[in-house]
Amino acid sequence: MEFNHVSVLLNETVDSVVTNPDGIYVDCTLGGAGHAHAVGERLSSQGMIIGLDQDEDALSVARQRLSDLKCQVLTIPTNFSNLKEALRNAGIYEVDGFIFDLGVSSYQLDTPERGFSYMNDGPLDMRMDKEAPLTAEEVVNEYDAEALLQIIRDYGEERWAKRIVEFIVNARQEKRITTTGELVRIIKNAIPAKARQDGPHPAKRTFQAIRIEVNRELAILHDSFVDAVSMLKPKGKIGVITFHSLEDRITKQTFKELSTACICPPELPMCVCNHKAVVKAKNKAIEPSAGEIEVNPRARSAKLRVAVKL
């Protein structure tokens, strides 16, 4: 199986997170194992790299790619929202570092039958876990107009959301929308020609929004980061790579919450929350170099945020 995927901010992530060659590191979004393999190359035979992924296609390729490492390797078929339970079931209670790469893999984007791509026609699917019940086809055809509007406006930050929803609703009344190509044509018709001349592909934001809804991507981030930090050893690190402002905002806010000693309302005269800071977060996100963006244009919007367990 061909699984071409260029890992974003590879060296920056590994340099930021890996500090102990004998440590245990978890790649929570294993994918094609680009980050995991680079981490594994830094580890001794006593070290361990653990990869989590809900996509069986990715796991199959990753296991093969990681087979040449001298460190211990464990892959677990699960979504990172289950990371604490999955790791404990594997006998792991403390971890030296976590990596989250929140982007969709190039393999998923470039495989039409997975339904993520607005560049190639395929079934409206978009499930990262192919056994999950909700598909993009169901979202597009069965959600009411108000729910669709909220998803495309909030998750896609699409200025033409209302018009796009109107066109989707009109189209599905005539015929069920079943392919990515059909949806792309509807979106293009909804967005005025002048607005389509500049910027990214006109369907990019809507596809992003539907993908986030199908996979509950934003809903699980905060709690997953908190779970990961709770399992970090002192001085262990968590690195999160985001690709759009919604993910980055949640990451930044969660790190701020975890690095703040008191979260009481400012009007209270004294602290009553007993909240303790558990991490120190780097203030500035790390972004790709111009050279990396030239080689891999998909890296353009990537940001890496890192926090250290106190």
Predicted regions and their residues:
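S-adenosyl-L-methionine-dependent methyltransferase catalytic core, i.e., the SAM/SAH-binding region
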Residues: 1-310
